[in-house]
Amino acid sequence: MGKQGSPRSPRPETIDKEEKFGRRSLDSLSGNDLLLGRRIYASEVSKAQGSKHDQSSGSSNKFWKKQHSWLRRNFKSIVLMISVTGFIFCMDSIMVSIFHSDSRAVVQDISRLSNMTLHKNGAVDASPVQMYSRLLNLASDSLAKNEFKPDTPNFREERSSKSSQWKPCADNNKAAVALERSRELSNGYIMVSANGGLNQQRVAICNAVAVAALLNATLVLPRFLYSNVWKDPSQFGDIYQEDHFIEYLKDEVNIVKNLPQHLKSTDNKNLSLVTDTELVKEATPVDYIEHVLPLLKKYGMVHLFGYGNRLGFDPLPFDVQRLRCKCNFHALKFAPKIQEAGSLLVKRIRRFKTSRSRLEEALLGESMVKSTVKGEEEPLKYLALHLRFEEDMVAYSLCDFGGGEAERKELQAYREDHFPLLLKRLKKSKPVSPEELRKTGKCPLTPEEATLVLAGLGFKRKTYIYLAGSQIYGGSSRMLPLTRLYPNIATKETLLTPQELAPFKNFSSQLAALDFIACIASDVFAMTDSGSQLSSLVSGFRNYYGNGQAPTLRPNKKRLAAILSDSETIKWKIFEDRVRKMVEEGQKLRTRPYGRSIYRQPRCPECMCKF
């Protein structure tokens, strides 16, 4: 149809219905056709008689007799035809009415389903919460305009060419000479019970290796404490390769699978117990020498219970620091079943092709997909996004996420159930407003904010995204901004069959290992919380093995909050420029600053060699 007022769509004139049909019949029919299949109006007869004044009245009577005779002969057929036509018309009207009714119902059902999701407890989500509707509309328009434009490099490699000058070398055995220990000189055994999830436990393992070397002790293969949060009974051998771990570090640290029988008495364990409250966070070597070594020598063992991030990064002897890197990047290999599932996961993301990068080789070993693929088509490139927007994190932040009074009540109830110490501490301190928390970068990014960052960086709608993370607070309604702008989203649950996931069911740490693999192997890794342990370890692996071609996108939450504070007025082009500058600043090549995590930033002489 044309636009209103155009020549193609003239406004119809009102005409008399009878006059219209009469004129059309007279103009279009001629001769005896006037008599067929329709009733003759008196006005037409009068006109016909006037126009044919040369005909006699006898002829007129004859004409009427023929007409009446024809009507009598065909009366039943005419009635039948009218009845059938009427019946068809009625049925058509009924079917159209039913179709439209069903269509409206389906549309309404889809709308309700898109605006609601079920929590595990059966409660229904409210309508989708959008804090930046205007920017989302601008982002959608921008994605539509750029969809068919040529692809750009688009943050698919690190900004500095000097990043490729750093090469992995923590496994250099020549440096291990200084840490060689004989079994006769061991000061005793160190037992470790690590807390937390997969990533916290990984850090605890490598810290324990460093402490064992520092105190000249024999390390008993670490145990993992059962957590009411993670609810995973997995132990070391369920997640990592025990024999490889022991063999790889044998020249620097003595590691055994079990404590000797003569040291297993309950009294001995209790007397030598050191809890995490007795060691300060990021303790120094002096702390261990003064508080742990005496117990080790006295009882022949020490039990570090609830162990985690209890060893600082500086000051620390060069070789002990290097040993941490060797543990994290070389000695800890995932168990074969995790490697195989991780290999299958990456294989399906890349559409049965493999990039065969050193990253994938380090992660997957012999399980890496080695199948050759005909043709010159490259493996599918993908972005891995780690969303940290779980209910516990959201509640603990004390921030406002646009859900109004219902959201505030829900999060307060969660805090009362899970964080009583937080509430107790808040009563004794000066309150900080949610607005101030957001302004200072203390609030976790929502899926909506993550979507705007990706769009601002120029990632196209067709971008393939692997989504890592736990249950998102708000469910699918919170995810709508992301899923609407970037529909090509996959998770381990959508890429692997229920049968393939079955061995990992109820083992959250093993499932997290699959996310760990998919994130490290990705072409681009984007995080929403730089403080997360998974993001820290993943970015460290990518720095160590990536050869400058494994970029990590790390938004500065404080700067992003300042950008989004202008959401109602800012132009999209300006928004893009500011977001790009923010991310580029975080991608600048840096060697590890003093005191910073060697797991996140391994570019330093202790872990890597510069050529």
Swiss-Prot record:
Pathway: Glycan metabolism. The gene is OFUT8. Pfam families: O-FucT (PF10250). This is O-fucosyltransferase 8. One of its GO terms (molecular function) is glycosyltransferase activity. PANTHER family: O-FUCOSYLTRANSFERASE 2-RELATED, O-FUCOSYLTRANSFERASE 8. Its EC number is 2.4.1.-. It is found in: Membrane.
